[in-house]
Amino acid sequence: MYVLGIESTAHTIGVGIVNERAEVLANEMHTYVPKEGGIHPREAARHHAEWGPRLVKRALEVAGLRPEDLDAVAYSAGPGLGPCLRTGAVMARALAAFYEKPLVPVNHSLAHIEIARAVTGFSKPVAIYVSGGSTIISAPAIKRYRVYGETLDIGLGNLLDTFAREVGIGPPFVKGGVHVVELCSEGAEEPADLPYTVQGVDLSFSGLLTAALRAWKKEDKKKVCYGLWETAYDMVVEVGERALAHSKLKEVVLVGGVAGSKRLQRKVALMSEERGVSFKPIPYELARDNGAMIAWTGLLYYKHGFTVAPEEAFVRQRWRLDEVEVPWL
């Protein structure tokens, strides 16, 4: 069984192909980088429309398949930026209609977790999902995921990127796989003292961002960068640990674009070791936004009979993880 997945929720257009053994046969992607400021949704959508067909062709070539060999086509239906979501959905509808393949809409947040479960072999992990727009702590429940906690304002990635943009050290925000805020902190002996806001299993980053921007103007810049990522990562690990305590689960996964941070991985690994739970980092190419995770989650839905007709395909800019039915849980 082969499923092709299209990811287009934000700045990355990705096309992946997987089989029923969760083997990633292709995982092609291209990222839109704005000339200034944050993501411009319509510009990003134009980028996706330009690169999407190329990536579909390349993914099929890498996998050694023809479109006729596919069993289904999956696409990220939300949450995300409207113009970007619609671009990916149009591509998926066109492929499914032309080649007469079943079409499967997939929740982007769920896909991050499911590819991590497949890679790690974990059955019921607490999932720490950290990306540009999201920071969510969840775990499997009955036929859906339970959200234990989340950001009350901006996502962790948004915090780091906005700070870097405002102080002039980015874009690009990631160099050699390391965020520029982490790179900026190298050489600092201690972190700047910045506010730490955790409320139960929820957390807030906006106050931390404001304080860091103020500190940048009057304190050692390396210390400010150190304080920013150190504080933010500690907050995330704390709420993850609380979710483990509440759920009594023994596994944890780290997913999303910020999951590629080695420093954050080390903090989660240390917490996991102290609690006696299992943690395995997953490859960055599968932790970030990518088509393979959409393909794999689409395959799971396809096996459970969840498909839509091309004319009934939908996108949802707002689509909470805990609203999604997950029949295989």
Swiss-Prot record:
Which Pfam families does the record cross-reference, listed alphabetically? TsaD (PF00814)
Q: Which cysteines are joined by disulfide bonds?
A: none
Q: Name one GO molecular function term.
A: iron ion binding
Which superkingdom is the protein from? Archaea
Q: Entry's InterPro entries?
A: ATPase_NBD, Gcp-like_dom, KAE1/TsaD, Kae1_archaea_euk
Q: Which GO terms describe its cellular component?
A: cytoplasm; EKC/KEOPS complex
Report keywords, A-Z.
Acyltransferase, Cytoplasm, Iron, Metal-binding, Transferase, tRNA processing
Q: What NCBIfam families does the record tag this protein with?
A: arch_KAE1, gcp_kae1
State where the protein is found.
Answer: Cytoplasm
Q: What is the name attached to this protein's record? A: tRNA N6-adenosine threonylcarbamoyltransferase
Query: What reactions does this protein catalyze?
Result: L-threonylcarbamoyladenylate + adenosine(37) in tRNA = N(6)-L-threonylcarbamoyladenosine(37) in tRNA + AMP + H(+)
BP GO annotations: tRNA threonylcarbamoyladenosine modification
This chain's function reads: Required for the formation of a threonylcarbamoyl group on adenosine at position 37 (t(6)A37) in tRNAs that read codons beginning with adenine. Is probably involved in the transfer of the threonylcarbamoyl moiety of threonylcarbamoyl-AMP (TC-AMP) to the N6 group of A37.
The UniProt record gives the binding positions of substrate as 129-133, 161, 182, 261
Q: What is its main location?
A: cytoplasm
Annotated SUPFAM superfamilies: Actin-like ATPase domain (SSF53067)
